[in-house]
Amino acid sequence: MIRATARSAAAPDRLWSLASDVERWGDRLPTVDVVRPLGSGLTGVGSKFEVRQPGLPKAVWQVTDWQPGRSFTWVSTSPGIRSTAVHTVQEDGDGSRLDLSLAWSGPLARVLELLIGRKARGMVETEARTFARLAEQA
């Protein structure tokens, strides 16, 4: 499992507003080219998004847990692999903390980890740091 944590002087609601606005990740994160909703309405459990990231095949992610102001989980599946990403915002003293995790399961999980594990770790760490920095700038 890949984990990354970033602390921010910003209030938790500000950090949440950035991390949960997945449709704008392409504008905010160097690790994401574009996120396109596959459907309409508010983001919540069942929402699906097509995500394109540099050097990775496009993936469809579906929200499986949505706790407004606190956390969301989404899952992407492809043959032999299930990817699960969790995004959690918490109060941390006078500011906030963002915890990100990415886990792979399935018969090809170990192969994927060997192929892109280092790259994925760097991307998750970059995302955590970027959201924390952007929250402080707003």
Regions found by a protein language model. Give the residues of each.
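Short, hydrophobic/aromatic-enriched beta-strand segments in well-ordered soluble domains
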Residues: 6, 98-102
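Glycine-rich portal/gate segments that line the openings of hydrophobic small-molecule binding cavities
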Residues: 27, 36-84, 92, 97, ...
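Generic recognition of short, well-ordered alpha-helical interface segments
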Residues: 10, 27-30, 58, 122, ...
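Hydrophobic ligand-binding cavity/cleft-lining segments
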Residues: 1-40, 136
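A conserved amphipathic terminal alpha-helix motif
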Residues: 103-138
